[in-house]
UniProtKB/Swiss-Prot annotation:
Protein name: Thiosulfate sulfurtransferase GlpE
Organism, scientific name: Aeromonas hydrophila subsp. hydrophila (strain ATCC 7966 / DSM 30187 / BCRC 13018 / CCUG 14551 / JCM 1027 / KCTC 2358 / NCIMB 9240 / NCTC 8049)
Gene Ontology molecular functions: thiosulfate-cyanide sulfurtransferase activity
Gene responsible for this protein: glpE
Gene Ontology biological process terms in this record: glycerol metabolic process
Active site: 65
Cellular localisation: Cytoplasm
EC supergroup of this enzyme: transferase
């Protein structure tokens, strides 16, 4: 995959439920702590190395932001770091929260 792909909240949820991907949330710490998708990894400059050490490069990664815009740059960056399959979640957290479970606090 040379470029990230777009994925709907529904398709992302199916991949995650099947254990076929990891979800990362790139929103600011306060927004993440207030509410985030269940099981999301809070990806920041400070947690990037840990994520890369924990998640194999052949594991599909789904990137979530607020509305689906910022996630595109982050998705492309993860591809450049060596991840094979990266998706930007269309509609971001706002699309996710309309359909699927969210939680508060640190994940």
């Amino acid at each position: 995959m040379d470029q990230f792909a777009h994925i709907s909240a529904h398709d992302a949820h199916q991949k995650l439920a099947a254990g076929a991907a990891r979800l990362v949330d790139i929103r600011d710490p306060q927004s993440f702590e207030t509410a985030h998708a269940v099981g999301a990894f809070h990806l920041t400059n400070g947690t990037l190395v840990r994520f890369m050490n924990e998640v194999d490069f052949d594991t599909p990664v789904i990137v979530m932001c607020y509305h689906g815009n910022s996630s595109q740059g982050a998705a492309q960056y993860l591809l450049q770091q060596g991840y094979d399959e990266v998706y930007s979640l269309d509609g971001g957290f706002e699309a996710w929260r309309r359909e699927f479970p969210i939680q508060a606090g640190d994940a």
